[in-house]
């Protein structure tokens, strides 16, 4: 075998995806053409930009286009572009393997979608992971790719039948750009495999999926001219026809663009297979002129929380593509928004570094952000089901904005929804919470934890449930952080049920005299426990938030909770956790029994061991981790043995 010809195996994840394509049961196999045309369009965008920025690049950009060629006899379909092209290494990296991030999650989600025979979910995944090239194997039993990078002399030929391996070789005398040739599977109407050598079929697919592509999509078509004389024969000629209108959707009035056109454009720029949840069309005139077409997706991408994930906004200047992931146009907490911004008064030679300082970009970003947030607000007030879909998919990300976007913090707080003890199914806004507050209640109560069930079983919640106070249940990691930034809503302070002191005695169950008497009765025990547990706690006091549990651990009003400390440590910041406060339920048998035992035999080691067990159970009840699990287990086993 030629030294420059190799047979390689696909990466494991790629083989699984290929298997899904080859044995596809999708009804919508037509969409493979959209994916290949989108890839070709991207290649042309990149070449034009590179040629503008690199004056030494010797390429002809006067006739950039996409060519579709069919061969009915050979049953092949070729999509060709004269764009940027790829090197051999890029072919292996982009086609032989999947993107470096998210491969494990892709493997798991593909398996689940395939096992459930969930066509919609599987199609969505393909677009989500940006691997539409593989969809060629839905309709082809062999795929050939020929590509030459602009400015390079050597070309690369890639070929695979989708069975786990591919061949790659270096070739000479290839045109600049990329061509993908599909050796089509036999037509099968039952399996939705159409005749993709049909001129009518190809034209209809281009019109449906890719009419808005900015580059001409050309194909040689047949023209029939009727006979001019009776008894004569019709004349058949062939000519090249441009199949798409090439109209920029964002430049057209919204009332002239159909819903279907918006959907297909979204799928093109977002590499998505599902429909957007909402379309936002904007046009600004005046100091800064720009047009924007933005989309709120209906599903979160797999890499939503990946720091290296690309943002979804494309920047154009006077309809010339500048960059595909312009993170300066949208705040990070709105990174899920997809779309296009076309500015009129910027230099084509703009760079990311320049954008960071550009006054116009900052102004556009502010306006886009406010428009997206106002659109979400409209969903919340007018289309509640769509808002709930949005919040389920993107709520965790939006809450990040509470920590970073102080200009819009008030709006963001109003947009947020939270689980609460009021309802198992329905989330609540803070405004709705305030409307339901009990008479005399002055604070908005909340609890943080890993899951709803964990919080509901927390000792901290007992008195709040018993007295009918609604508590917000915050289970996202970001919740631990933003509650330290947003301290009040509508004049009502936010109060953690596990921090500081809370007064729930407004109903007058106990008089102050009774509480003073309890304090006197337990004073010796509290002082002894503080000394005995001094390695773990800074204070021991009686609690009015416990009804069933013997004890719970509390953090100072302005202290860092253990969960927040874990979050900081996970991000590389070593935050020390201060000692906490142990609160006791003065009516619990264990606490009253411990008080009596301390009075009777304070020097008995078993009494001190009981104090350790009391502290350990409080720690475990809130989902914490014991400092010395073996010691705790030893004491507990000894106590259990004595009961037998």
UniProtKB/Swiss-Prot annotation:
HAMAP family, per the entry: HSP90
Top-level taxon: Bacteria
Job description of the protein: Molecular chaperone. Has ATPase activity.
Pfam families xref list: HATPase_c_3, HSP90
CDD domains in alphabetical order: HATPase_Hsp90-like
Region (A): 1-352
Assembly information from the UniProt record: Homodimer.
Name of the protein in its database record: Chaperone protein HtpG
Underlying gene: htpG
InterPro entries with a match to the protein in the record: HATPase_C_sf, HSP90_C, Hsp90_fam, Hsp90_N, Ribosomal_Su5_D2-typ_SF
Region (B): 353-566
Nucleotide-binding found in the keyword field: yes
Intracellular or extracellular location(s): Cytoplasm
First and last residue of the signal peptide: none
Keyword terms: ATP-binding, Chaperone, Cytoplasm, Nucleotide-binding, Stress response
Residue span of region C: 567-644
Family the UniProt entry places it in: Belongs to the heat shock protein 90 family.
GO MF assignments: ATP binding; ATP hydrolysis activity; ATP-dependent protein folding chaperone; unfolded protein binding
GO cellular component: cytoplasm
